[in-house]
Amino acid sequence: MLLLNQTLATTEKQTALQAAEKFVDELCISYSAKKGRGYARKRQKNLLATLQAYKPQNPKDAPVNCDKCGKPGNVKNDCPGSMRKPARPCPICGGDHWRVDCPQRCRSLGPKPVSQVSNRIDGPQGSCPWL
């Protein structure tokens, strides 16, 4: 995973440098018409050197550690160690998971049989009763 991140970071840097070089070339072409070719070439070299030496303060390819468990690869919101188990069983199937994660929840969203149709007016007839 780290190798993939490094490869992506290298590719992104190369793409950014190519785009910057193209921008500098276009800028120098338009500028050379005003000032002369020698000055434009010198300016182009200075801009390219500045762009290649640029290092961001917080690089994206640096490993990120979780604030809760301290392990690299996840962040606090996605930490698998912070997942709480539900206090009660699932009201739909009785399993040990949250209601929103129930595999039996709303298998078919088609119309309900007449015996299950409620007299509620706040939702469509074929909607899931557990939403």
From Swiss-Prot:
Q: Which InterPro entries match?
A: Znf_CCHC, Znf_CCHC_sf
Q: What does the record give under GO molecular function?
A: nucleic acid binding; zinc ion binding
Q: Which UniProt keywords apply?
A: Metal-binding, Zinc, Zinc-finger
Enumerate the residue ranges forming zinc fingers (CCHC-type).
64-81
Q: What is this protein called?
A: Putative uncharacterized protein COL25A1-DT
